[in-house]
Amino acid sequence: MIRFLFFLLISLNFINASSNKRYGAGLDIGSKGSGIFFNYLSGNVEKNFDLVGEIRYFDIIGDTESIVYDYWTNQYVTISGQNLLFIPMLVGFNYHPFVGKIANNFSPFITFRGGLNFSIDGKEGNGSYKETWRKADTQWSTAGFIGGGIEFRWYNQSSIALHIGSDIIKLKKKADQKTNYSGLLIHISFNRFIID
């Protein structure tokens, strides 16, 4: 934990010193669940390396979870659901190997991120919101993401990035009978450049 905080402080110092800064938000769609995220990117002047800080809110779906229509109540209902949330906090980098070699602001990249995950395991069942989350089990574990993607930069100081890769989340103790929640993740990011 102390090493991660030290790395984060060094990373923030690098972020503030660079000139190619942007922030964004987006959607995560994965084999284990879905969610939203917020990120902050700081790149070098050559635009081939970005340091990334990111926080996510990820709702984990159960292996047998499905949504059915209840004709009696005229509502959609989740059956066999689980109440498990992940909040990963990651720091990493994007490397753009083809900067200046491809026209039209199209930039493929590879990415690596690592950090901590805070998991909240709520009580299962059909209780109220308060009953579900009142005495939820929590734990910290390591998390990471390895993948590739494409960033489209536009002249109006914004960009869209599509990442596809492997989310690596292994818990220290079981949450809903599992410790390994790694899997495929599609990460869609909408970014805005910060003009100094």
Set out the residue ranges of the language-model regions.
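Short sequence motifs at beta-strands and strand-loop junctions characteristic
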Residues: 28-32, 81-86, 102, 136-143, ...
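Outer-membrane beta-barrel "beta-signal"
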Residues: 90, 180-196
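Membrane-embedded beta-strand positions of outer-membrane beta-barrel proteins
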Residues: 23-27, 38, 51-55, 91, ...
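Extracellular loop and loop/strand-boundary signature of outer-membrane beta-barrel proteins
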Residues: 23-26, 74-81, 130-136, 171-178
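Short glycine/proline- and aromatic-enriched beta-strand/turn motifs that initiate or cap beta-hairpins
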Residues: 16-59, 65, 189-196
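Short loop/turn motifs that connect adjacent beta-strands in outer-membrane beta-barrel proteins
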Residues: 17-21, 45-49, 98-107, 154-160, ...
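Gram-negative (and chloroplast) outer-membrane scaffold detector with strong preference
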Residues: 43-129
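Sequence/structural signature of outer-membrane beta-barrel proteins
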Residues: 22, 32-34, 60-64, 100, ...
